[in-house]
Amino acid sequence: MATILLLLLGLLVGLPLLRAHGVTGSAAPTPPPLPVLPVPSYAQLQWQLSEMALFLHFGPNTFTDSEWGSVRADPAVFAPSALDAGQWARAAAAGGFGRVVLTAKHHDGFCLWPSALTNYSVAASPWKGGAGDVVGELAAAARAEGIGLGLYLSPWDRHEPVYGDTVAYNEHYLGQMTELLTRYGDVEEVWLDGAKGEGKDMDYMFDAWFALIHQLQQRVVIFSDAGPDTRWVGDEAGVAGYTCWSPFNKSTVTIGHIIPEYSRCGDPFGQDWVPAECDVSIRPGWFWHASEKPKNATTLLDIYYKSVGRNCLLILNVPPNSSGLISTEDMQVLQEFTEIRQTIFSQNFAANATVTASTVRGGLGNQQFAPSNVLQESIYSYWAPEEGQSSWEMLFDLGQSASFNVIQLQEPIQMGQRVIKFRVEILVDELWQTIVEGTTIGYKRLFQFPVVEGQFLKLSIDGARADPLISFFGVFTDSFSVTYSLENHEKPSVVNSSEVIMLRTDHSFGNKSIATM
């Protein structure tokens, strides 16, 4: 009996030590902080993670050298000689685009699938003897390449005779939408264009459309000027606002009637999660024209910085030509654009950095929310501070001096968008010098600036809707961009408004009560 009592006493005395060293699992883990509403749905989150989509404007306009087309265009003009939807899908997959979005019906009303509700479709064309189905071929090609399918169905239909009759046309439109969403498998995005020119007045029953789309495709996102799932950024240049919130009030705008600055910037007080989508064409027009040439790869890179790099999704239009292929010169630009991005973002100078932070949620030793989590490029692990702070700091020791001109920041947006104001500084000659100041971060924020060199960086967050959460911090070199390349070290005469260079100099090294992970 005495031996048993001694053993029990030893266990009781040793238990605190075992707990202190993590031998037992009895200590309760620290839960994640509460999300800050609104937050994305599953479909919205997957949409944002894909970063880019490839837009495909194709139809009779391709053959008639027009943009909005004509209701009088003979279906016989649609006669691609070498249409290869597989080429379109392969180009998208190779370029890092998460989905393809096809103009299944543009404003001219011509349908790229054999719709039973109109005689103005591929079924009336000579292509494949009237037995062709562009939507079907692209759906199969997208599945084969492991990318998603999106469909554009223009609300404005210049051909349909019942357009202008509220009940009849809404029934017609819902019928065509049902065909598209029940014949071709999963559809990840439905694109509703707000454009409308001349013609009859028409009241669209958008709520009924949205309900049907979500009913037929549970993981779809719907794009329009006003959502409900993703919004137009307000321009066709592919450029988002310097400040860009995903929170938004859908009731503030209507389809076809936007407030440009509100759409560009979003709303920190918005009640709805409606992230912005930036649309732009690789060519001057949306449809292919033999007389037009594509943008170059560095122009696309600049657009990438100002769209994906400002918390948006980039949808880049690359229109197939009249043969039914993406032109060789466009393919070359896409390849160069991809190679440039891979070169820039394949070497992160902060990948092996030592990271410290002013506080850590759950205590300095809590690995779950450790500062080092920001070195993993994933929104599902992140640094979180203790509650009750009003400003926050993270310090980065790169291990050795590096020259760089791009910084990437990310928030775990599944927890809501939080950061309102931040800055990044570099230690130069024992002085902290500000290299960038920013407002929002969101899913991804990319900053360009003239080349700097140093080993120690500091991220200071000066304002947030709630305790800030950071999921990634990266440091890169871009030697391709004309403005901020290694060959152009001098500060440009005109600095883009999204970059504020060397604003502040002081001797403060931040809070010394830091955690190192």
From Swiss-Prot:
InterPro entries: Galactose-bd-like_sf (IPR008979), Glyco_hydro_29 (IPR000933), Glycoside_hydrolase_SF (IPR017853). Its EC number is 3.2.1.51. The keyword Membrane does not apply. It is an enzyme of class 3 (hydrolase). The keyword GTP-binding does not apply. It catalyses: an alpha-L-fucoside + H2O = L-fucose + an alcohol. One of its GO terms (biological process) is glycoside catabolic process. Keywords: Apoplast, Glycoprotein, Glycosidase, Hydrolase, Secreted, Signal. It holds the Pfam family Alpha_L_fucos. It comes from the Eukaryota. Glycans are attached at N119, N249, N296, N321, N352, N496, N511. PANTHER family: ALPHA-L-FUCOSIDASE (PTHR10030), ALPHA-L-FUCOSIDASE 1 (PTHR10030:SF27). Alpha-L-fucosidase is responsible for hydrolyzing the alpha-1,6-linked fucose joined to the reducing-end N-acetylglucosamine of the carbohydrate moieties of glycoproteins. Active only against 2'-fucosyl-lactitol when heterologously expressed. Belongs to the glycosyl hydrolase 29 family. This is Putative alpha-L-fucosidase 1. It comes from Oryza sativa subsp. japonica (Rice). The lineage of its organism: Eukaryota, Viridiplantae, Streptophyta, Embryophyta, Tracheophyta.
